[in-house]
């Protein structure tokens, strides 16, 4: 684990030196946010087996709450962040209170419905959100106005969240979550309150997505509902699946690959969508454990 953290710190330190143009440094910031989002969703689907298709809603809640507090009400950004995290986490718990007793496709439909409702609220509650017109002129956090500083901030937060979650899943809490994922009935027979622990994972995942959302508006400078449509939720899920859900490093790998792959394929125009889709299909069909499974197989072959 120490080796992984050291490698991550080295990559974070060197990446902006290798990718010095504003465009690529912007991609690095997006990648760091995507790592946060993938980690947040992996806690829910990878460790408790809950099929959540509404994670983009919590990303949006963090973005809008922090922006409305800072831009409309004049709050300090660093005071708005914990409020935005709490708002996303509490709404995640509220949804979980109704949804955790659902399983499989029913939970997927319920979470998808929540994402659609959130999206419609952002469009139609114009007095607060400005609707489809959006909110403009949003600045990055104070002290992190240039791209390099913002990247190091978001990447540092992503590393911190990784360490917290890694310790969590290695603890008895992680064992409890995995027991629920493998067999909820057997877990209940051991005295585990599955609904309570699933709600905990759902709420914590929502809070982390809300944290990622706090940094998105300052990066792009604008905030519009279209940035949080259902495609965003499916993109997060693709990152987790491609990297390897139920592992800690898998979602990080998936986020990096699926952030940079579309950019590297941009030179082939519309064909990039075909290549991108084909790559995803091949991973799902032949490596159900994701790229982590491929890495493990290569290590075994070498040994």
Predicted regions mapped to residue ranges:
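Transmembrane alpha-helices and adjacent helix-loop boundaries
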Residues: 1-303
């Amino acid at each position: 684990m120490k080796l992984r953290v050291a490698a991550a710190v080295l990559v974070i330190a060197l990446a902006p030196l290798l990718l010095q143009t504003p465009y690529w440094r912007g991609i690095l910031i997006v990648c760091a946010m995507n790592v946060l989002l993938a980690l947040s969703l992996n806690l829910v689907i990878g460790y408790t087996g809950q099929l959540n298709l509404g994670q983009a809603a919590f990303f949006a809640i963090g973005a809008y709450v922090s922006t409305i507090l800072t831009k409309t009400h004049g709050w300090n950004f660093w005071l708005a962040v914990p409020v935005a995290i709490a708002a996303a986490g509490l709404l995640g718990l509220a949804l979980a209170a109704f949804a955790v007793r659902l399983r499989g496709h029913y939970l997927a439909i319920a979470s998808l419905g929540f994402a659609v409702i959130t999206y419609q609220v952002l469009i139609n509650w114009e007095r607060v959100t400005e609707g489809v017109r959006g909110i403009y002129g949003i600045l990055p956090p104070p002290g992190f106005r240039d791209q390099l500083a913002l990247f190091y901030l978001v990447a540092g937060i992503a590393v911190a969240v990784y360490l917290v979650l890694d310790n969590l899943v290695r603890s008895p809490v992680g064992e409890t979550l995995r027991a629920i994922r493998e067999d909820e009935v057997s877990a209940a027979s051991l005295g585990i309150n599955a609904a309570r622990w699933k709600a905990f994972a759902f709420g914590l995942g929502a809070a982390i997505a809300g944290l990622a959302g706090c940094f998105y508006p300052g990066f792009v400078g604008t905030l519009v509902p279209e940035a949080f449509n259902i495609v965003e939720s499916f993109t997060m899920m693709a990152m987790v699946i491609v990297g390897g859900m139920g592992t800690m490093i898998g979602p990080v790998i998936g986020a990096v690959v699926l952030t940079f792959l579309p950019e590297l394929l941009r030179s082939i125009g519309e064909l990039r969508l075909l290549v991108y889709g084909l790559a995803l299909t091949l991973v799902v069909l032949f490596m159900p454990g994701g790229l982590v499974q491929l890495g493990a197989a290569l290590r075994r072959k070498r040994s």
